[in-house]
Amino acid sequence: MRKYWKNIMADFTFAHREEGFDEHIEFSIRGYRNLLDDIVNYSRYFVEDNTNVIDIGCSTGKVTLKMLDSNKDHCKDARYVGVEIAEGFFDDLDKRQKEIKKQFPWANIEFIKDDICNYKFENCSLVTSVFTLQFMPKRHREKVIQNIYDGLVTGGAFIFAEKTIAQNSLIQDMITFNYYDYKRQNFECKDIMDKEKTLRHMMKPNTWKEIQSMIYDA
């Protein structure tokens, strides 16, 4: 295991890009890179000029930048906003924004520190969220999804990915231990368990039925 990942495993929420956060997540979540690629590809169907594209929990701004790059030829006047609440990412995000301005001087993009429970969604052609809602208090999730839905333009979309828990305990055990086997390819057992302990009070996944219910009610 790479040495700098030990610190990230201990406090991954506040890890910096220079310390390998993006790479760490790719090695932690099977298919993560493909997931991001799919989201970026799907964005081409929804991003429109003179609308907002919001990336919730943008961390290092990777997806925000990829969507900007992917849509630059046909939607140059879209506005991109990366919303992040973790203070530890903002040194990286400041650097990311400067890099973007050099590469795309015309780009309308910003990264802001905000709690999405309080964020006002409006005129959005696309809102994305990658493993973010699961870290929010459950009592706020339905309201946030409703706010997102209310802020979409006609034909707009909310694309999100979430960790879920199975309703069947045997299936949940199968998924969990298979996931541990996968993570042991890149991380030490103690580091995996330490991270799991850290996440206990932070991450509260829903079942798929609960997520469906929140979506249908919005």
In which residue ranges do the predicted regions lie?
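A conserved beta-strand element that flanks and buttresses the S-adenosyl-L-methionine
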Residues: 128
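Class I SAM-dependent methyltransferase SAM/SAH-binding core
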Residues: 54, 59-117
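C-terminal alpha-helical "lid/dimerization" subdomain adjacent to the S-adenosyl-L-methionine
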Residues: 164-216
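Class I SAM-dependent methyltransferase Rossmann-like catalytic core
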Residues: 7-11, 15-35
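Conserved alpha-helix/loop element of class I SAM-dependent methyltransferases that forms part
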Residues: 31-49
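A short glycine-rich, Lys/Arg-flanked "PGG" loop and its adjoining helix->strand segment in the class I
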Residues: 142-154
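Short conserved loop adjoining the S-adenosyl-L-methionine
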Residues: 118-122
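Conserved beta-strand signature within the Rossmann-like core of class I S-adenosyl-L-methionine
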Residues: 155-163
